[in-house]
C-alpha cells in the first residue's frame, strides 16, 4: 500500500486555495517528500505528518516554487534534534544552493545529509527520469518491488492448511504432503509492485511518456487549462497531461501545478476526462491510497 498526500498543488505563487508544490509519499514507514515549496514545513507540522519521519527528499528543479521550502524543512529537522541521515536527490546545483545557504545563515545540521542519484532498498526503488522544462529538471519514479505470494485460494481448495508447507513453498522448495509432491511454481503468484511517477514542471515529451508507462499514478504538470502557449513556458496544459497519460497507459492521472489564475477548476477536469477518463484534480491536503 502506498499513500500520497497532496500538500501543495499550486504553481508560481501560493493562492488562497493552493500552496506551492509538495507531495508526501508513504509506504510502510518510509516517507518520501517530492518537491518542497515555500511553507511545506508548516503544512507538515500543522497536519501532524511527521517532518522528522521524512527519510528522502526529491527536488525536480531549482525554480523557487519547488525548492524555497527546503531550507526551512531541514532547519526544523535540526531543531527537532534529528539524528538519522537525510537522503536528497535533485539537480546538480541543489547541493551548492543548500550549503551556501547554510553558511550564510550560520546553520550547521545536527544530522548527516547525503546526496544520492537514486535509492534502493529491499522493498522500493526511486529512479529519476528526464523531463523537459526551461532549466535542468528531472521527474521521479517510485516503484515497489514485485512480491511473491502464496496462492491461498488454491491451497484452501486443496485443503492444505499446514503453515510449514506454506513456508517451504514460499522459500521455493518442493514439499511432499500426503503422498503428493507440491511444486512451488504451482502455488506461488507474483504480486506486481505499485508505481508512482511525478513529473514536476515539464512540457509533454517522449522521455516522460517512456518513463511513466503503466504506472499506477501519474502526477503531471497541468499549469494551464487550454493555453496553446504552455510549452513556450516549459509547462503543460490539461489536455497535454491527459494525452501523456493516455499514451503511457497509466492507471490514474492527477493534475497538479495549477496556476493561481484559476479559482474554479471544474473545466480542467472536464477537459482531462474527455481524453483520459481516469483523471483527478486533488485539492491541497487531500490524499489517495493505492493498493
Curated annotation (Swiss-Prot):
Its cofactor is Zn(2+). It is an enzyme of class 3 (hydrolase). InterPro entries: Metallo-B-lactamas, RibonucZ/Hydroxyglut_hydro, RNase_Z/BN. Zn(2+) 2 binds at residues 65-66, 201, 257. Its EC number is 3.1.26.11. Zn(2+) 1 binds at residues 61, 63, 133, 201. Belongs to the RNase Z family. Homodimer. This is Ribonuclease Z. It comes from Saccharolobus islandicus (strain M.14.25 / Kamchatka #1). The gene is rnz.
Amino acid at each position: 500500500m502506498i499513500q500520497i498526500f497532496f500538500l501543495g498543488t499550486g504553481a508560481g505563487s501560493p493562492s488562497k486555495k493552493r500552496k506551492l508544490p509538495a507531495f508526501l509519499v508513504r509506504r510502510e514507514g518510509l516517507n518520501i517528500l517530492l518537491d518542497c515549496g515555500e511553507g511545506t514545513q508548516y503544512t507538515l507540522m500543522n497536519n501532524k505528518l511527521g517532518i522528522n519521519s521524512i527519510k528522502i527528499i526529491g527536488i525536480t528543479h531549482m525554480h523557487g516554487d519547488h525548492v524555497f521550502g527546503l531550507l526551512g524543512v531541514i532547519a526544523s529537522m535540526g531543531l527537532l534534534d534529528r539524528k538519522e541521515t537525510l537522503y536528497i536527490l535533485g539537480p546538480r546545483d541543489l547541493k551548492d544552493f543548500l550549503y551556501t545557504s547554510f553558511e550564510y545563515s550560520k546553520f550547521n545540521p545536527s544530522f548527516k545529509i547525503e546526496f544520492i542519484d537514486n535509492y534502493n532498498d529491499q522493498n522500493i526503488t526511486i529512479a529519476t527520469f528526464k523531463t523537459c522544462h526551461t532549466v535542468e529538471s528531472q521527474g521521479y519514479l517510485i516503484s515497489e518491488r514485485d512480491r511473491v505470494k502464496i496462492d491461498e485460494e488454491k491451497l484452501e481448495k486443496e485443503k492444505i492448511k499446514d503453515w510449514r508447507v506454506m513456508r517451504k513453498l514460499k522459500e521455493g522448495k518442493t514439499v511432499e504432503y500426503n503422498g503428493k509432491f507440491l511444486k512451488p511454481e504451482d502455488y506461488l503468484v507474483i504480486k506486481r509492485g505499485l508505481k508512482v511517477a511525478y513529473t514536476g514542471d515539464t512540457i509533454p515529451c517522449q522521455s516522460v511518456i517512456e518513463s511513466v508507462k503503466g504506472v499506477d499514478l501519474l502526477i503531471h504538470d497541468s499549469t494551464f487549462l487550454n493555453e496553446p502557449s504552455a510549452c513556450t513556458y516549459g509547462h503543460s496544459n490539461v489536455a497535454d497531461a491527459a494525452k501523456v497519460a493516455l499514451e503511457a497507459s497509466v492507471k490514474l492521472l492527477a493534475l497538479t501545478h495549477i496556476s493561481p489564475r484559476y479559482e474554479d477548476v471544474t473545466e480542467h477536469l472536464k477537459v482531462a476526462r474527455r481524453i483520459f477518463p481516469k483523471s483527478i484534480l486533488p485539492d491541497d491536503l487531500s490524499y489517495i491510497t493505492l493498493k
